[in-house]
Amino acid sequence: MNLFRKWVFFSFFLVLVPIANAQSPVFAGVAPSMEAGIGYSYLNVDVPSQTRIAMNGVDATFSINFQRRFGIKFDLGYDRAFNVFDTNYHADLLTYMAGPVFYPIRRRKFSVYTQLLLGGARQTGVNFDASGATSTGWVNRLAWAAGGGVQYRLTSSFSVRLGADYMRTWFFNSNNAIEGQNNVRSAVSLVYTFGERREHD
């Protein structure tokens, strides 16, 4: 079972457990809702044995909010950089993660959220070996992200979301050994909400 299949299994598990618990009475004003978002992402990537590089791309999310303060989020991101270290090679990072999202502040017009996502990341890129020669390759390993942000409602269905995360991924260093990366991601997204939520200030 490869990493992607494990992520799919984990994602279904995250959905099924809250649904099973949802058989208890639902209180007025906390009806479940779903959100789909897509937007621009900026990723500052730590390349082992080298300096950091900037990637730009797209981030797509799907959230199921089972309660007023709690939900599950699925996150799929793709970011890319061109002519990395002036080598004419590109680098990209594909992430696929899921996990819980919490809303410490949730109002009719805006909300504040925190999240912890777990899944995988496949990075393709370039590095230099000990002799200074160019080395290219890819790594697909476990990844996780932790962060938060704010979401402002424009209409009853559309919102704007601003978020930032610390992201942990992996890539090879100058000795061709796999090493952890400390990355920072920020994103701005347009979000569409399915279902009504009667929030009060």
What positions do the PLM features span?
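Extracellular loop and loop/strand-boundary signature of outer-membrane beta-barrel proteins
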Residues: 45-48, 83-88, 130-136, 172-178
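Transmembrane beta-barrel strands of outer-membrane/channel proteins
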Residues: 34-42, 74-78, 114-120, 150, ...
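Gram-negative (and chloroplast) outer-membrane scaffold detector with strong preference
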Residues: 23-24, 61-132, 141-144, 152, ...
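Predominantly the C-terminal beta-signal and adjacent terminal strand-loop region
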Residues: 152-201
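Bacterial N-terminal signal peptides
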Residues: 8-18
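Membrane-spanning beta-strand positions in outer-membrane beta-barrel proteins
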Residues: 35, 71, 109-111, 149, ...
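Short glycine/proline- and aromatic-enriched beta-strand/turn motifs that initiate or cap beta-hairpins
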Residues: 22-66, 72, 185-201
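Bacterial N-terminal signal peptides that target proteins for export
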Residues: 1-9
